Amino acid sequence: MSDRLTVLTSKSVFTGTGDLPFEGFVAVRGNRIEAVGTKCEVASYLTQADEVVDLGDRTVMPGLIDVHTFYTGWALRTLGSDLSGVADAKEAVSLLRAWKDDHPDCAAAFGHNLPETLASDAENANTAAVFDECFGDIPVVCFTPGAETCVLNAAASARYGFTSQACYAEKIWRMMSDFLALPEVRAGYSDYMSMLNERGVTAIKEMAFDDYYGFADEMARREESGELTVRVSMMSQPVGAGANLAYAREARERFRGPFVRFSGFNRMTDRGVWAGLAEMIDPYEDTADAGAAGKTVVEEPEWDLIENELRAIDADGFRYSLHCQGDGAVRRTVALYASLPRDEYGRLLRRHAITDLENSDPTDLVEFGKLGGICEVYPQILTLDRREDCLSMMRRQIGETRLLHSWNRRGMEDSGCTVCCGTDLPLLVPSLGESIYSACGGFFADGLPVNEANVLTLVELLRAWTAGGAYDLMREDEAGYARGRQTCRYLRARSGCVRPRLSRRTRSFG
């Protein structure tokens, strides 16, 4: 490692743990932090420095930590043959055949960027029929841009057990062993890390379904060969079977290096309010869609399974992240966590978390804070929608009063919960500017606000992206600004004067 000393000076240094940025410096020797201090302490480092970089009013801060990512979902966007230029299914067949000829050991033919016109409700069956005719018993799966929908033939449906209407990551688990083994998918992890690094992300909590279907070997290889530029805390999300504690114990022992660790388990409880699948404390409004009117949830989550898994996971020393969108699911989860062993201060022994928390009752946030709970929120989520498109649906489903309890990051922070940030990548791609715009300003994509009393301050959000994420990943002794830790990121904006409405222009760089 180089012994070169670089000193970064800035009018705005944010450590991730303090309340305010300060004028000061960060001294970096090689790729390790040697010192952090105020402007009064910089002189001796300037005299030793091989290079001094004055960043002016740009903020110097630790790398961002994204606590909810899916490489398995990201990889679908470039899986197989690029079909973006095809005009019809027959043209797609030619490209798919060429790809399959180049991949004789792969059980299926895959494609991406299939034009939406060939996957729409009207044409999906016709495209699938062409694939049936031309490929017979060879499975064919082609994803549209963004991999939100797909076309698959009968052979693929039989082998993988999902449909074109539901081809998101949790549904395609039977396909993972086929595509995660592909050389280009394994090589693609380098581009994935580069994308994260370019956005200031230096650590992630990665959702690795079941036993990761062979991809854990790739992570071990990259750790051993020094090819990782992102610290990865892997979570097993049970989809093909229940929580595999035998695999978890093995992974905990296997991954003990500076980059890859095994963190525990992740599971969905309920789902979206729009579909009546978010479990609410009180029934949905009489105006609710999707058959939810008068019910607290259309399909009850598997609470017995979740409770049994949680107790076994906790007893074995692992942590669990439970994904909750409705206030009823949040309440049930807080109660489950409260029933687990705690320390002398009443705090959970394991770092159990709740992910998303789209809607939550403030009293449950207070109880979760007493437990030392962790809230993994999606700070950019409002940027996906226009305000009235989202709020009109929410009003129909849960009404105006409960709408006020949505995206309540203020309540989480004030209740003493540890708040940290995730993107559900590839649903969202990490963007510090977008997260300030959404989580500090409360703005939707069209610039109109919601629940402004529920937002975080800028410093609270930056802390969530850094120190909060480090605590969630159990890496607080490795991340942040302390001697010996790896280097930082800087922002093209002063943290003290960024206005949320203008923050979308804020970017992070390595």
Where are these regions (language model features)?
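His/Asp/Glu-enriched, well-ordered alpha-helical/loop segment
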Residues: 176-177, 311-320, 328-352, 357, ...
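Non-cysteine beta-strand/loop elements that form the S-adenosyl-L-methionine
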Residues: 70, 257-277, 373-383
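A short helix-to-beta-strand connector/capping loop
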Residues: 48-49, 228, 257-261, 348-351, ...
